[in-house]
Amino acid sequence: SGIIGAATLTMAWFVQPVLMYLKTPVSWYGVIWTVLNLTVGFAALWSDRVDNYFGPRKMGILILVFIVGGYISLAFNLTYAGLAILFVFYIFRGFATPILKGYINQMTFSDMRATVLSIRNFIIRLMFAAIAPFIGWLNDMYSLQIALLVSAGIILIPGGILLGLQFRKNNH
């Protein structure tokens, strides 16, 4: 949950560099941000239905694949058509947060729930604070594409390991 949260937060910070790369008029930034954030909100409304349809195992895979895939796809589509990738990413951002918090709620005793969710948010911010300067440096020294691809790897490796461990735990 923390890795996915950090991944979606990091992508939120990539939106402006992507818009700058595309030479988007600044007057459109607010419009695009608003539509992206509304996309998250509407997706969150459907998250329970989506989770019930796919179930926790498939949903975990889908979230990881679409989040990592969003970084990779955007890296290779830094065009205005690539903005559609951002919208798909933001749909999964809208699914991921309530679904993953729901899983935490199911696994946590009520007297510890607020603490666990606070620690989750702290981990997200801590991970972002740890990787953001490096990702920014990659963007400045190499390219936006490299920064996006390295971000995908930073998410995929621990995300895949932790998802695999979770599946293994649930099978035993």
Regions found by a protein language model. Give the residues of each.
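Loop-to-transmembrane helix entry/capping segments in MFS-fold secondary transporters
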Residues: 26-27, 110-120
